[in-house]
Amino acid sequence: MIIESRIEKGKPVVGMETTVFVHGLPRKEAIELFRRAKEISREKGFQLAVIGILKGKIVAGMSEEELEAMMREGADKVGTREIPIVVAEGKNAATTVSATIFLSRRIGIEVVVTGGTGGVHPGRVDVSQDLTEMSSSRAILVSSGIKSILDVEATFEMLETLEIPLIGFRTDEFPLFFSRKSGRRVPRVENVEEVLKIYETMKEIELEKTLMVLNPVPEEYEVPHDEIERLLEKIELEVEGKEVTPFLLKKLVEMTNGRTLKANLALLEENVKLAGEIAVKLKRS
């Protein structure tokens, strides 16, 4: 198989993207997060398969050394569409949510974790492949909603149009990455068992969609969305395409004196914990 899977058979596993490490965080914090996520996986009894493309080789279960090499050498940011191109050209590539879900499903991983998903950008025709991949691949994705920089109304409507199931984990509101509230209601679940009951129903009715499990940022790290919106209005966009999200996230870190970075790290850690719990109980079911 073209994918080098380092997953130990029979153990629960969670797939994780590489874009969050390579393009979403400063190098020091990225490595610290990788180590913490690995520590959580050992404590909770699951495998964390960080997925990336190294010199054209798709790897599920990257090591810290490989991740550092990717950050040092540079890596394209790829969605599902670009996978065959970077593989054929022997490039390094960091996977987004869409590419991670696609590759995870090819090797039997059903649970994927991220911080925030892509969506519809404001003011231009720019729709993330995350949405289209979630509309056609059955998986469980644990996230803290969509990234706060997006057009919330348009993205929420697109999620409905694409028939992507949403459930709030101990919340009634759709979270917005750094922010716990959006004013948009979602069905609420209180425990992992309820998540799995919904997912098993999806299997029974053959619904080939990704179940979005929405886990809000811890309250003490929240940056209110109205504050994020005010800051975004002040930013002059200097890039386009796949560079927009990393550019804006970096600017927000600077403008909030690191508060959004702390929020990002906190929500990622909590999402890894929840995804691991789901994977462990899914394996037992």
From Swiss-Prot:
Positions annotated to bind substrate: 77, 97, 128-130
GO cellular component: cytoplasm
Enzyme Commission identifier(s): 4.2.1.70
Catalysis: reaction(s): D-ribose 5-phosphate + uracil = psi-UMP + H2O
Alphabetized InterPro entries for the sequence: Indigdn_synthA-like, PsuG
Binding site for Mn(2+): 126
Residues forming the catalytic site: 17, 147
Leading EC class: lyase
UniProt keywords, alphabetically: Glycosidase, Hydrolase, Lyase, Manganese, Metal-binding
Record-level GO BP terms: nucleobase catabolic process
GO MF annotation, one: pseudouridylate synthase activity
Cofactor binding note of this UniProt entry: Binds 1 Mn(2+) ion per subunit.
Cofactor names: Mn(2+)
Subunit structure: Homotrimer.
Family note: Belongs to the pseudouridine-5'-phosphate glycosidase family.
PANTHER family linked to this entry: CARBOHYDRATE KINASE PFKB DOMAIN-CONTAINING PROTEIN, ZGC:136858
Function text: Catalyzes the reversible cleavage of pseudouridine 5'-phosphate (PsiMP) to ribose 5-phosphate and uracil. Functions biologically in the cleavage direction, as part of a pseudouridine degradation pathway.
Protein name (database record): Pseudouridine-5'-phosphate glycosidase
Native source organism of the sequence: Thermotoga sp. (strain RQ2)
